[in-house]
Amino acid sequence: MYESLFGEKFSDAHDASFDVNATAKSFFKLAELGEYKNDDISKENIQYEEPKLRNSNFDKKIKKTEVSVEKNKNDIKSEFIHLHNHSQYSVLQATSSIEKIVSKSIEYKMNAVAITDLGNMFGVFKFNRIAQKNNIKPIIGCEFFVSEDRKKNKFTRDNPDKRFNQVLIAKNKDGYDNLSNLSSLAFTEGLYGQYPRIDKELIKKYKKNVIALSGNMFGVIPKLILNQGIEAAEEELKWWLDTFGEDFYLELNRHDIDEENHVNEVLLEFSKKYNIKIIAANDVFYIEKEDSTAHDILLCIKQGEFKSTPIGRGRGKRRGLKNDEYYFKSQNEMKNLFSDIPEAIN
């Protein structure tokens, strides 16, 4: 449609923010041509203002300072790498470009990095090419949407689709093939609205050479800890441990959120009780701390909401991240965050 209206292609096609720009520009052009009629607005008063997407004019926050690392950091012998990152291919949910993810890994002297986009693997080819070109080991994963029954697509308010997010990471080429199968089947058999879904039946079938993380607050175990209690979460944990064995890891995130701190305490108890390895993560949705405002506006676009609408659950609220800690942190920042749990990085 854009090419028909303007006689040219637009740059950065399939970059989420630029796609939104092209859609908005096309809408205003159609209104100007009289295709959309509104008695209250004359077409002479319709004016499209080009957004400054490359150099965002959002309010800048105070420049971040490097966190000083405490002496317990000396107990951390390994280098930290980010294993839970979302790129712009998590459509309208993350602002990190693949180029920036790789360049930040280089800047922070990380020799590997992962992408785990929400519900799809659209960015894998580009990520693999750019990472290898820059001598960074690409770790390929996906944060899948998991439903009780991927093929069920009729629900009611009393019996909704009960989904959770699940991070799966390929160990090797065979693992990548299994993730690809899961992603394809999510779209061909499990698509419900905007959610391509898999289920435990598929996970068991395609688990070979795949690593499973317990995930963020939308993972099934953290959700059960918060909503149903430790016993229910422990029963669920046993399924993942039985299914993945040593390839199942408990993911610890520290975004300075009370509920998350409680989840971490329970996960650490599970780790000791069942001898499950833990990993530190940061659930990255944008690159720099000051990018949090732009990211929040992107979430508003996805929901059709105003930024002034408060974040939360229920009527009159919108979805959003609770603070500005979901950025691509340096090794020093992550080692400082987990200086009391060095084994989460070692």
Task: Give the predicted meaning of each segment.
Residues 1-52:
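Acidic, Mg2+-coordinating catalytic module of metal-dependent nucleases/exonucleases
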Residues 48-346:
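Phosphodiester-processing cores and adjacent nucleic acid-binding clamps
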